[in-house]
Amino acid sequence: MKFKQFQFLKQEAIKKLILLDTEHSSFVPKSASEVIASDAVMLAYIGDAVYSMYIRQRVVEMSISKVQVLHTLVTEFICAKSQSKAFEQLESILTEDEQTIARRARNSNVNVPKSSSVREYRNSTAFEAVLGFLYESGQQDRLNELMQEAYSITLRGLSHG
C-alpha cells in the first residue's frame, strides 16, 4: 500500500470513529448471528487483544517487578506457536459457531510472518478469531473457559520445554 493511500484510509477511519463515538456511549454485545457475519480477520484482531490482556493480567498476578521478565513470559504465551498448539487441543471442544469462525479465519488471506510456519499462523489466527467472536457476542463465560484452558495448555508446554 502506498503512503498516500494509507494516509487517506487512516483519515477515513478517523472520520468513522468520530461518527461512531457520537452514536455509541458504551460497548454493547452483538448477537452471535451478527458476529458470525463479521470479517474473521477483524475478529482475530479483537481476539488477539483480548487474549493478550488476559495473559498480561495472569502474569502480573505473580508480582514480578522486572518488566523484561513479564514481557518475555507474555510473548511466549501469545506467540503463534503457543496459540497454535493450544488451538489444536481445543479444536475438538469448539461449538458449531466457533468451528465456523475458526474455519473462516484459518482460510483467510493473511501475511504469514517469518517467525512462524503457515500452519501455526493460520491456527493462531483461528484461535484469536474464536476469542474475538466470543468477546463480541458477550459470551464471557465461554471466553474465560477457552482462555483458561489455552493458558493451562501453554503453561504445561513451557514447563516441559
For each predicted feature, which ranges?
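Double-stranded RNA-binding/processing signature
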Residues: M1-G161
